[in-house]
Amino acid sequence: RQELFEKASNSTSDIIFLDLEDSVSLGDKKKARKKVIEAINDIDWKQKTISVRVNSYDTTLIEEDIKDLLKLTSDRLDLLMFPKVSSDKEVFKFDELVTAYEKKFKRTKKIGFEIIIETTLGLININQIALASKRNESLHFGSADFAASLGAKTTSIGGTNKNYGVLDDNAKNRRFFLNDMWHSALFKIVLTAHA
């Protein structure tokens, strides 16, 4: 919605991501893509970094997302965000498509990549994924889809789970301390990104 784009452009955020994936129903995908392209071109984003989360690799929409974004947006577009990445093969394909469209549409600014790890396979393959393209600028973790890929029940996105914790070592009157159920996955992503 236009008012949300305007609100984002006037915020104190330094990076804005516009969504074509989870927040958009299947029947509204093309309309949303058109609105995002218009927003990138028409709104004064000031010095903000602009990223667009495209549809996932396993859909027929991703190539059209990439093509239209690179054909129809100004150099104001900085990054493409790729959800549910599970292998380096996917990143190779993204790089191949983006490189071809940058050349075809004579884009002068190289587009960077943001990679979202949202599956168990993605976490297992994270080292190869991180090294798959020189365009990779950041790694993200999607806890809800990751939980779904595990078949785990999650009652909240972000924050703590009241049923996940540790007990202190005191044998009597042991106290329960909340823990982050995604700490291990997050730390692996941080280590990989840092390396």
What are these regions (language model features)?
Residues 1-195:
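Expand to "…catalyze enediolate/carbanion chemistry for C-C bond making/breaking, isomerization
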